[in-house]
Amino acid sequence: AIPAVEYLMSKAGGGAKRWVLLGTDYVYPRTTNKILRAFLHSKGVKDSDIDEKYTPFGHSDYQTIVADIKKFAAGGKTAVVSTINGDSNVPFYKELGNAGLKAKDVPVVAFSVGEEELRGVDTKPLVGHLAAWNYFQSIKAPANTEFIKKWSTYAKAKDIAGHKDKPLTNDPMEATYIGFNMWAQAVKKAGSTDTDKVIAAMAGQTFTAPSGITSKMDEKNHHLHKSVFIGEIKADGQFNVVWKTPGPVKAQPWSPFIPENKGKKDEPVVVAAAPKK
């Protein structure tokens, strides 16, 4: 989330000064926005320039919320960081269009809108808005061409509904692909499928991702170091990559922007085993 906000703050991203943090009411959006609010404070953004809103799962009436966003945006260059979940994204973007809020005026960056979510929906209200992922199908790289080809061949051979005629790849698929290949490498290194031996062998594993960039599993916490891409939604449901990190971002399981994480190292918390009876 932080790289996406840094992009929107930049000249290339529009130079946003005011922020709407809009999400579905559950733990991921609330934790993300807690981190983002603290990050924005560190950049000199005042609470008066941050508007935080939540809606229940399945929410579909965004008329009032979009009207509030439009009013808030009148106070200065505004961007929306969306952690809206699932089907609620469609009515939200539709209402933005109804209200005349265009991406060039109030850009929205989402963390749950990808190629699969855009399949079969009217993309007109979404064109120009943004999404942040570690992978997009449109990335130009030989490794990605090969990845898409493999999936296309498999989907057709297995007659997979929705993919046999129009195969799509997305971020969760890429993450699974990386994870499985790293696991296979670890099994080979360990010379065993024993869980503890494989876990130990996973530390430090590297793999060239479909993005063409080498991902690494952190030696201490087993989170991946991955690149971040910002993509602009196109009419065909694909993304035009407009920005990316210079390289993989180091895994950081304990955000320094949450006060209770102060002093925690980027490694797992060791919990003592319960005494045997």
Q: Could you say what each language-model-derived stretch is?
A:
Residues 23-26, 135, 186:
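Residue-level signal for short, function-critical loop segments
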Residues 24, 111-113, 235:
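Cofactor-binding loop segments of dinucleotide-utilizing enzymes, especially the Rossmann-like FAD-
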Residues 206-277:
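Solvent-exposed, acidic/polar segments of extracytosolic/periplasmic ligand-binding ectodomains
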